[in-house]
Amino acid sequence: MNIPCKTVWLKGYVDEGIPGPEHFDIRSSSVSLEDLPDGAIVVQAHSLSVDPYLRGRIKRKNPLNQKSAKGGTDVAIDTDTGETIMAGFVAGQVIASRNSAWAVDDFIGGAMDFSTVQILAPARLNATIVWKLTGYVDASNISLGIGALGMPGATAYGGLCDVLRPKKSAAVGGEATQSPETLFVSSAAGAVGSLVGQIAKSVYGSVVIGSCGGPVKNERIVAEYGFDHAIDYTTLSGEDGGKAELDERLKAVAPNGIDMYFEAVGGIHFEAAMTALRPHGRIAVCGVISKYNDAELSFNKIDIGSMIYSFQRIEGFVASPWLRRQRGDFLRDMSQWIQEKKVIPDETFFEGIEQWPLAFQSLFVRGNASKSGKVVVRIARPSLDEKKETKSE
């Protein structure tokens, strides 16, 4: 039996500027369910992730373009033009299996091709990151598997709980003398930042300050996510790119400085956080979205000397240790917080695989009020009867 398949392809490298639909193709093919190798599974995608980190993958100078960006899988990459299958995080369901660890109808999340249907052979399963979502989601909320229960959730969980390590305030069960620590979150209305702020507030009792673009998002992070303060970066101005004004606004809501900064942006946000960082302050770095569209990456300079006697710490990290359950129990904790309404995932949906390029472009549009939380491309799934009617050629 053959199942029709659609796949997102990158036409060629996009070294600078905002990528758009003109840079991608949606190509049709089919996947055969016959003669599956031992250990293989077939995954039908329900949701495709749309993430800022993929911007780096489509640049010529990204070293991942010289080999597979998916953990050792075989992907045809034209290193001269950059033409390749796009890949990232996918949530779906197992529709055929010759692997004892995976049953038909299991829900799965993982790093895969952006295809509606695909075979994961044993070598691919062993090389990539996959996690079982069965028991945590159902067909109605499987998109959480690429959001709060996927890479963004693991990034928020790992960066906050294990890297920044907030001290629980007395108000949420911490030591009686522990006052709330202050956290500054960049890209606060995004997939990761929105979760970071909610966890910090509801689980640790922190004072949470968020920066995001536009009045709609700034109102949302306070009214819906529970942030204490919001800073609209789109209103910053000045010859220094708004750095002095950001310093002033941050000081107005955190006159005694900040204890923690969750970094996803870079640029003036990082500089303002360093200026406001208190002794024993911590910074967790998961991304620098302000630089992703530049042809050449450039990063902030750090005054290392000032950090020594202030006992400050900066740590970069990625989500994989928590997705692989090498650190903590991310799925258990996050799913519990969702059930307890301590975390309310926010999602923005685009319908159909054809919309993936437009959804990706939306990540980089300054002050885009229509986008908040996790951006997800939902894929219409054929019914079981439709699959049965699909004949082998």
Q: PLM features: residue spans?
A:
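Hydrophobic beta-strand signal
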Residues: 8, 42, 108-109, 184, ...
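C-terminal capping/lid region of NAD(P)-dependent oxidoreductase domains
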Residues: 2-4, 342-349, 357-393
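NAD(P)H dinucleotide-binding glycine-rich loop of Rossmann-like/cofactor-binding domains
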Residues: 78, 84-93, 101-187
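Mid-domain Rossmann-like dinucleotide-binding core that forms the NAD(H)/NADP(H) cofactor-binding site
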Residues: 146-240
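Glycine-rich phosphate-binding loop and adjacent beta-alpha segment
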Residues: 204, 221-222, 268-343, 379-393
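Eukaryotic N-terminal low-complexity, Ser/Thr- and Lys/Arg-rich leader segments
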Residues: 1-30, 35, 381-393
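Glycine-rich cofactor phosphate-binding loops and adjacent beta1-alpha1 units
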Residues: 167-169, 173-178, 224-225, 229-314
